[in-house]
Amino acid sequence: LENPEINITAVNDPFIDLDYMVYMFKYDSVHGRFEGEVSTKDGKLVINGKAITVFAERDPANIPWGTVGAQYVVESTGVFTTIEKASAHLKGGAKKVIISAPSSDAPMFVCGVNLDAYDPKHTVISNASCTTNCLAPLAKVVNDKFGIVEGLMTTVHATTATQKTVDGPSPKDWRGGRAVNNNIIPSSTGAAKAVGKVIPVLNGKLTGLAFRVPTLDVSVVDLVVRLAKPTSYEEIKTAFKEASESSELKGIVAYTEDAVVSTDFLGHHASSIFDATGGIMLNDSFVKLIA
């Protein structure tokens, strides 16, 4: 909505009606109340005077994207994450599909990291996960400047919609079935391994895990790496400062030396914000970085 180069023509949601959609857009427990105007008119969602067609199809193959001129579809259900499943959107007239999650077979791209590898022949691509979008630029800057021999990643991750407010059945992930509001819950994540897909030279060099914590938004990536080229923490800070100002990574990587906490980043547009005062170094080749 804020990008003048993007024209949102339609949205599909089979689970809520139009009036409820207006309510959910207007009020948000994390980001607060929407400051603009949102309403309905003639069966459409109207945001700041812009009418948006609303579909309510469970099967993406039945969504008539072509009738509203939608060329690019963001597949963000978390269900249709393979090329075969996401390609169903193409049947309705869409030209390209971007999966907002990791995919087992779709080409994966992270802004600032490997967009140069994009081939227009691709009709379905993955934009990876939120964690990978934070970790991959972090790893790229370090690897390009100092080289990564190996590393371990931990993400301290905010609550997600799949978690439970009270203990409940979760046969495939017993710990994931525990109440979110009073637990730190160990979990798996494929984010570190996914970095190997967008930075092939790091394939097999990184792995990681997650802790789900009772916060609503903003997560942390804690990356511990052994460097190929000895350096100092000051040189690492300089590398990230320069990256945040470069034409390649400006707006994707940000840099801060302030004594910030997680809520200070609510609504931040950067994918990866390097916390210069958050990291530590054991020696000139072994370092923990925070973003």
UniProtKB/Swiss-Prot annotation:
Judged by the first EC level, this protein's enzyme class is oxidoreductase
* Any one cellular-component term (Gene Ontology): cytosol
For D-glyceraldehyde 3-phosphate, which residues are the binding ones?
Answer: S129, C130, T131, T160, T189, G190, R212
The record, for InterPro entries, names: GlycerAld/Erythrose_P_DH, GlycerAld_3-P_DH_AS, GlycerAld_3-P_DH_cat, GlycerAld_3-P_DH_NAD(P)-bd, Glyceraldehyde-3-P_DH_1, NAD(P)-bd_dom_sf
Catalysed conversion reaction: D-glyceraldehyde 3-phosphate + phosphate + NAD(+) = (2R)-3-phospho-glyceroyl phosphate + NADH + H(+)
Alphabetically sorted, this entry's keywords are:
Cytoplasm, Glycolysis, NAD, Oxidoreductase
Kindly tell me the pathway this chain contributes to.
Carbohydrate degradation; glycolysis; pyruvate from D-glyceraldehyde 3-phosphate: step 1/5
What processes does the entry annotate via GO biological process terms?
glucose metabolic process; glycolytic process
CDD domains recorded for this chain?
GAPDH_I_C, GAPDH_I_N
| NCBIfam families xref list | GAPDH-I
**Enzyme Commission number(s) from the entry:** 1.2.1.12
Name of the protein in question:
Glyceraldehyde-3-phosphate dehydrogenase
Report residues binding NAD(+): D13, R58
Record's subunit section: Homotetramer.
Q: Where in the cell is it found?
A: Cytoplasm
Organism, as annotated: Boletus edulis (King bolete)
Q: Which GO terms describe its molecular function?
A: glyceraldehyde-3-phosphate dehydrogenase (NAD+) (phosphorylating) activity; NAD binding; NADP binding
Q: Where is this site: Activates thiol group during catalysis?
A: H157
Family, as annotated: Belongs to the glyceraldehyde-3-phosphate dehydrogenase family.
> What are the positions of the active site?
C130 (nucleophile)
Predominant place of localization: cytoplasm
Q: Does the keyword Oxidoreductase apply?
A: yes
